Amino acid sequence: MIDMKAFQELALSFPHTEQVPHHERLGFKVISRRMFTTYLERNNTANIFLTPTEQQLFCEIDKVNIYPVPNKWGEKGATTFELDTIEKAVVTEALLSAYNHVIKPKTKTTK
């Protein structure tokens, strides 16, 4: 089980990250960039922002406790992780993946 304190430590363990309020959730983002995950204390869940392909792979690990967010964000890869039942290593891997997408330099398209 991963509780709020453990999740905060994991999310903030990546370089240049910060915790910010996000509606009723805690948001974790790269400073001066976008969020890579949010945490909801009342049900101990995290929404981790993956690619749709990564989302599919993580959902295959545990279809009951890892699933797409049920809205447009979920179609884009936002994935709910129920932290009471998921191994820390799985959550850490998902957070690292989401973090890497945020820090990755954007490629410029030429016309």
Q: What do these predicted regions represent?
A:
Residues 1-111:
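Charge-dense, helix-prone N-terminal extensions
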